[in-house]
Amino acid sequence: MTGAAMNFTYKTVMPEDIDILVTTRIEVLRAANKLDDDVDMTEVAVQSRAYYEKALKDGSHTAILVYDKEKIIGAGGISYFEVMPTYHNPTGKKAYIMNMYTNPAYRRMGIAYHTLSLLVEDAKNKGIDAISLEATEMGRPMYEKFGFAGMKDEMELK
């Protein structure tokens, strides 16, 4: 970790942190989707809580919150799952990075890059090399700098 990114605290979320994690998740979704505060996110919050309660307990999700003293300024998460083994991924284990966010006042300080490195390290420590993510236009250059590349062999049903 270099530069300004070292001045902050990166905390791996524990089950007792679910309240703040759900609140942060809703804030990230509002920001990413440009949703006003009057948009009802109750169902998303309820489902997010249920997801985190299960996934943090069974290890199928790791979340990181970034603090500037007591203020949350960033977040990131990685979900783990299995598919059928393939030639390129004989274990079938995969990881998907999501919920990456940095408060606009703290951007361009290396916070997202360091959060990403912690999440990738967590996956590698679990023996998972097949790591993917969905990138916004703003985030794409940072992900490419880290080593992520566009995928040509996958499609999504619309």
Q: Where are the language model's segments positioned?
A:
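Conserved GNAT acetyl-CoA-binding A-motif
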Residues: 116, 123-135
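Conserved beta-strand in the GNAT
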Residues: 65, 71-80, 96, 101
